[in-house]
Amino acid sequence: MKNKITLITISVAFLMNFSLNAQTEVTESQVTSAEDLAKQLANPVAALISVPIQNNFDFNVGPLEGFKYSLNIQPVIPISINEKWNMVSRTIIPVISQSDVTALGSNETGLGDIAQSIFFSPKEVKNGLVWGVGPVLLLPTATDNVLGAKKWGVGPNALVLKLQGQWTYGALVNHIWSYAGSGPNDIDASFFQPFATYASKTGASVTIAAENTQDWNNDFFGGFAGIYYAKVLTFGKQMLQLGGGPKVFYGNNPFNPDWGVRANIILLFPK
């Protein structure tokens, strides 16, 4: 536990130091840009190239009350197909380190299964309504059997959201079925993520979101709700968003943590 606390302390200190060394307030000439970027970041299919680097620290995981750290690298790349449509690629590359989760004294570290989502979304926004649909793919890239399902998976992916002044709210859903792979357990799982974000005119934002997964094969439901504060900053010539907040878990999944902390750094590449 001492090592876990030390790890969190170092991570928080790094983020605070990074924020202080960054330009903690955008200049007047950047206010409009910062506000616009904060709003675009709340929209999963915005025409904005970004690279979120998401750190998750989860505590009291499962019956052995273990610890799990997940680093999710999530590049988002929008591609203009024609005058009316965008295609947005969203990839989640998880790097996981956990202890006392599968057995007392156990330690596993490695790559998890990569998830690749594609959204096709109309460029024209009518009445503030934004939507996108496409496929989601699960790739069996885990380097340890306990860090992934070792299954190929595929399914539908969709989102809908409303842009209303400083607010953005909506939901993302998908469903994955496995169809091949060496893993012992088939996948039949639904994911649902409602969210609401308020973006201020200075580039700061507050998001309330929940991430829920229903495992139909095992009749397990698990998820968490979190509230996150974030701020658009500049570091030299690089624009980024820095943020984080607490998470509280719920559901009947026996490997749910009790609580956690999320810290994000998102590199921004506006056109």
Positions of PLM-derived features:
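Bacterial N-terminal signal peptides that target proteins for export
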Residues: 1-8
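Sec/Tat signal peptide C-region and signal peptidase I cleavage site
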Residues: 18-22
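Bacterial N-terminal signal peptides
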Residues: 8-17
